[in-house]
Amino acid sequence: AAAAAGKVIDPEVLHDSLGARVAEAAPAPLVVELAGGLQVPLTPAFTQADWLARERPRIVLVARSALGTLNHTLLTLEALRARRLTPSALILVGDPHAENAATLAAHVPHLFELPILAPLDRAAIDGWLADHPIAEAIRGGTKHG
C-alpha cells in the first residue's frame, strides 16, 4: 500500500516514532496494529516479522475464528517462535469454534474468543473488556478466559 501511494517506509523512522509514542503513552500501554500479517513487507527487504524481532514488543495475536485459521495461526506462531517471539495471548474473532480454540490453546499462554462487535466502537470494546479478564491475563494472570 505504501509503494502504491508513492511512500517509503523507513524502519529507523518507524523505530524512532514508536519510541516517542510509547513515551507519550506511558504508563498506559500502547497498542500498535500491524497491517495484513506477519510476513507483509514494510520494505522490499524488511517485513513486519523483522520489525517485531527488532522491537521485541509484547505481542497479542489476533486471528479469525473461521475455516483455515488453524493453518494460518499455527504458521504465524511458528514464524514468531523462529524469531524467539512468544505472543502473550491469542484472540480469536468471530463465531466460536470449540475445536479450533482447543487446538490453538495448547500453543499460547492465553486464548480469548471475541464475538464480532457491531458497532465496533469504544463502548462495545469497553463492554467486552468489562466481562473478560484479558488485561490481567496479558500481564500475567489466568490461563484462559
Predicted features, each with a name:
Residues L77-G145:
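C-terminal lobe/tail of nucleotide-utilizing enzymes
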Residues A1-F46, A53, L67-L74, E78, ...:
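ATP-dependent carboxylate-amine ligase catalytic core
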Residues R64, G68, L92:
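Glycine-rich anion-binding loop/nest that anchors nucleotide
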Residues A49-D50, A102:
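Active-site phosphate/pyrophosphate- and oxyanion-stabilizing loops and adjacent acidic/basic residues
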Residues R58-A63:
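A contiguous pocket-lining binding segment that forms or flanks enzyme active sites
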